[in-house]
Design a protein with these regions (language model features):
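Beta-propeller-forming repeat regions
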Residues: 1-235
Length: 235
């Protein structure tokens, strides 16, 4: 295999990257953690479009299921000490270099989120690093994890009509890491914090609730579940 490294763009404080399927072709999104743009690239590294020029503070981006013109992203998470105005936004393509950006939900200190699908429904899992602070580097107010059923159509949401969130778990200091894990064919969220590693399992149906399993009880920054040794069990 021959690999060639090349510079495709200059982006100060480049932080977040996400795959994006558009017109049947693989693309990828790149955004920054500070006040900087978000760009859409072809799989070959050609810069195709500017999605936004500001405000930045992007920790996470994910395409909306079933949409080739829409994704969700965090905005205004600049640092643990400067993220009280953090939120999740909806980016919808209206034309070339023409993207509409609307607020889906204000979620102070939101660091990670994920969209999980189960039995034809999509769920938003929202992970907030902490729940407040009174001074710099204040970690006395632990983070929380929220969830919401994600409607098929997001056109009705904006800053004055936000998606309601339901608290799933609090007391999560340094609620930092998130990854998606297929558990026997079910998409689940793996969330990490000082209290350990927790697996969030979406409802099986309308009558069921979320399941939360603690997988580990020591402080963890980030985690990925994988069957490394081939024994059929994740490590």
């Amino acid at each position: 295999m021959f690999v060639k490294k090349k510079s495709i763009c200059e982006l100060e404080k480049c932080y977040s990257i996400a795959p994006f399927q558009q017109n049947g072709a693989p693309r990828f999104l790149v955004a920054a953690e500070k006040h900087a743009p978000c760009y859409l690239f072809s799989e070959n590294g050609e810069k195709l479009e500017t999605v936004w020029t500001e405000p930045g503070g992007v920790m996470t981006m994910q395409q909306v299921p079933g949409r080739e013109d829409q994704f969700l992203a965090t905005h205004k998470f600049y640092s643990p000490n400067d993220s009280a105005e953090a939120r999740i936004v909806i980016a919808t393509r209206r034309g070339e270099n023409d993207w509409q950006i609307r607020t889906l939900v204000e979620a102070p200190f939101v660091h990670r989120f994920g969209i999980l699908q189960r039995n034809g429904k999509a769920y938003l899992l929202v992970c907030c690093l902490k729940s407040g602070h009174d001074y710099k580097d204040d970690w006395t107010k632990p983070g929380k994890t929220f969830a919401a059923l994600l409607p098929d159509n997001l056109d009705g949401f904006d800053e004055t009509h936000q998606l309601p969130l339901t608290l799933l778990k609090d007391g999560m200091c340094h609620n930092h890491g998130y990854s998606m894990y297929f558990d026997h064919g079910v998409q689940t969220g793996v969330v990490t914090c000082d209290e350990g590693v927790f697996q969030f399992i979406p409802p099986e149906n309308k009558q069921a609730g979320w399941q939360i399993r603690q997988l580990y009880d020591q402080p963890v920054s980030d985690a990925v579940l994988c069957d490394f040794d081939g024994d059929g069990e994740p490590e």
